[in-house]
């Protein structure tokens, strides 16, 4: 089954036929998928501006904005078919919310054995933080303010804290996040 956004604010579970895997593909059975609070909420509300439809397209998205669209990119599952070195391994993939799927083996990343699927599903959030730092890399001695102590902001602040001689301040207008921001 797959989750589809039928129209802004209205989703549905649809059946699907799992395609036959090709050479070099893997069949993954989903263990966990995550909904990003920012991007996917924007998509669910139908808030993606037409000028951003191409830029916001997810790697294995089906359909188009505002809907119907099968969207998502935080998926952790177990490889059930595919190259021997991947079979039985837990993997992360930028795939929508679906119970099973077929993708090229290169589209999955093996999750370390000591990382539970409930935590591994957050890998996409860390990827967003890494991309932000690639777009605006800090220099030694920089003083950086990260605005927003949500998932992405906390990941950015944590990564910045590992840079030598970079002073990081995490701030948020939400008073309930003050403890996280101060840490």
Language-model features, listed with the residues they occupy:
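Residue-level recognition of beta-strand termini and adjacent short loop/turns
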Residues: 6-9, 22
